[in-house]
Amino acid sequence: MAIKYRIKCPQCGEVLNTYHDTQCPKCRNNLYVNQPAMLQLYRKGNFYGFAGAFGIYINGQPYGHIGNKESLIFPLPYGTYNLHIAVGVSRKCNDLLFTLTPETPRMYAKTYIKPGFWTNSFGIEVATPDEMPND
């Protein structure tokens, strides 16, 4: 199975997964996966059994959730982005700031939970294409 694209409708804000160009189910706006740049995010599997979905925020805007061992592609225009991961009320995360340009149109990142003594936090690291799953 191919990796899903995660698209946010610029007209109504609806977030959806797709494998190809589609229409927003809420407002019928045309949505395209072919953007000049992209972020591929992989959530590493968790030994501790924490399989709840992680909330994804790009530039403070919600982009849905990512499940355990899931990989998603976010088609994005060129620009600077802040990636933040959170679950429920736990917002402790080392955000990833990245810029997509014609020279660097792709960003690969992996996220995981970092168990702590009192509370858990979330890690996000830059990754290489070789670290990304193929399906």
PLM ranges: what are they?
Residues 1-135:
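Short loop/turn and low-complexity linker motifs enriched in small/turn-promoting residues
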